């Protein structure tokens, strides 16, 4: 299977665009680390059906990301945040509480 972390992130971004069953299976497989057999048993279906569903959903999530580019936008925001924080840390005159406050607010912007 593909990079588990990458798919897990795509589930976080686009999971609401999947059906309830697709979302549940993808979450069980990528976030809860259940095996195909365990998921098949829970869903009362075959291991092959779960495997096919996971492959289909992975392609679907990648397709959403190619079109909407949320992961690239978030990555870019984190890079900008790190650059800003590096510049702030160069200035030793700033109070640590102010730096922490700015860091928290930048995090809110990224996650908005």
UniProtKB/Swiss-Prot annotation:
Pfam families: UPF0122 (PF04297). It comes from the Bacteria. Gene3D superfamilies: Winged helix-like DNA-binding domain superfamily/Winged helix DNA-binding domain (1.10.10.10). Belongs to the UPF0122 family. Might take part in the signal recognition particle (SRP) pathway. This is inferred from the conservation of its genetic proximity to ftsY/ffh. May be a regulatory protein. This is UPF0122 protein CPE1714.
